[in-house]
């Protein structure tokens, strides 16, 4: 992850208007992985869609409920993906409002074949926090249109950060959750994240004429195309760095991470190692590197091409 300093520092629990019919409430869960906290969005002026309720927090639940103005009700609860900083509060919010919970699926939904094989072989996640208890009231399909009284959202399946990750198109704006953010590059951590899927999802979003991205963490991204170009170039540069290192000698993901992520703080080195392994899985699939034996996080990889 590459951290980009900015002046984004809203008050947790306070609803901030971003555009007509759109407000954001920051959850009180800052961390090196969540930046200032999770962005919860309220869309609509009558029937409200809550996008990413956030982590379990009584204070955040109350802030969402308090943001409902006279004549408004929460009609939809939409979860972009099942990391524990985005989905767990959905159940309590549904109990409080009666609104259905919509998402692409449970924690396993959308997982690629190679990541399923890694998971079945015993590879555990890197501690990002998967909400294994999550089950939506209704599963969404790619391309589906969700209708509210005065809004509609297009479901765009964007696997990569997580197999069940979706973005939500709202006219020329897009809620990109953790796939595209301005403050950092997205974590891709096998067996839940797949870099091949991530790059394909970036290209898919790049082919659309967006004016603004509303991310899961951090400030709005005002140059969507430029940010996507940067993310794609950043990943390709990481790939070149890995291949250059492997041209010198075979190495593990851990060794490569410490050689390449020289400016990354210690708390984020574990995430860096998972990102490197994601690249190695992708490069293995492209027959550019090979592990010594089975594909696994601790394998030593050598360059083939």
Name every feature range the model reports, one short phrase each.
Residues 36, 55-149:
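Active-site HxH/HxHxD metal-binding segment of metal-dependent hydrolases
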């Amino acid at each position: 992850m590459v951290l980009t300093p900015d002046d984004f520092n809203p008050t947790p629990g306070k609803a901030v208007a971003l555009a007509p019919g759109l407000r954001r409430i920051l959850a009180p869960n800052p961390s090196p992985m969540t930046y200032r906290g999770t962005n919860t969005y309220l869309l609509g002026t009558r029937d409200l869609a809550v996008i990413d309720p956030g982590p379990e927090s009584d204070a955040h639940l109350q802030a969402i409920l308090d943001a409902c103005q006279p004549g408004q009700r929460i009609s939809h609860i939409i979860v972009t993906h099942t990391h524990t900083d985005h989905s767990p509060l959905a159940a309590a919010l549904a109990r409080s409002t009666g609104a259905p919970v919509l998402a692409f699926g449970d924690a396993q939904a959308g997982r690629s074949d190679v990541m399923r094989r890694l998971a079945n072989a015993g590879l555990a996640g890197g501690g990002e926090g998967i909400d294994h208890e999550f089950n939506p009231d209704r599963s969404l399909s790619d391309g589906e249109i969700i209708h509210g009284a005065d809004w509609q959202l297009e479901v765009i399946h964007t696997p990569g950060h997580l197999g069940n990750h979706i973005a939500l198109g709202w006219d020329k704006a897009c809620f990109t959750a953790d796939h595209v953010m301005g403050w950092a590059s997205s974590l891709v951590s096998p067996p839940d994240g797949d870099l091949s899927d991530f790059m394909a999802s970036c290209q898919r979003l790049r082919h659309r004429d967006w004016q603004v991205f509303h991310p899961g963490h951090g400030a709005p991204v005002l140059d969507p195309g430029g940010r996507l170009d940067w993310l794609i170039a950043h990943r390709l540069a990481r790939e070149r760095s890995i291949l250059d290192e492997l041209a010198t000698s075979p190495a593990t993901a851990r060794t490569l991470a410490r050689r390449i992520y020289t400016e990354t703080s210690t708390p984020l080195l574990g995430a860096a190692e998972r990102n490197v392994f994601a690249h190695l899985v992708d490069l293995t699939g492209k027959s550019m590197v090979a592990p010594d034996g089975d594909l696994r996080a601790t394998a030593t990889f050598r360059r083939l091409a």
